[in-house]
Amino acid sequence: MKHKILFFIFFLILFCSLGQTPCSNGFAGEYPCNNYDLLSHIPVSTLANNSGNPEGSDIWGWTDPATGKEYAIAAMTNSTAFVDITDPINPIFLGRLDSNAGNNYWRDVKIYDNYAFIVADNVGNHGMQVFDLKKLRDITTPVTLSSDVIYDNVTLNANLIANDRVNDLAVII
């Protein structure tokens, strides 16, 4: 019986550590690191849609003030992905918001007052997508999301700056 318990504990520890890769000699597995361990990984092929040759371009985060859940918001060349990272060893891909105007080299995301503001460069009339992050609370399986607002009076945007202290959002062209 003692050996069965030790065997069970060994496999429980092994199972719980899957996906975790320590940073060693500047790498966590195949990924460069700087004294940060890799806790888990979701490939771009899961996060982005299949249009073009998707790559990652930016990442931001949001903590839901009502639930305390933490989310990663990953900008891809063709979409923006939303991942529940409350348990960083077991992240949950919630869904994606596709680009408003095709693929681009750079997409930027900033958070202000529970909203994600998303811009892109080199895609014509992308404008600025606005997404209510509180919608993430009710998602149980991955979905394709929609913008709540598309502000189309701006084009070819490379960056956003959000300043919570003065309630200001600046679009950098």
What is each residue range found by the language model?
Residues 19-173:
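Feature marking well-ordered beta-strand scaffolds used for ligand recognition
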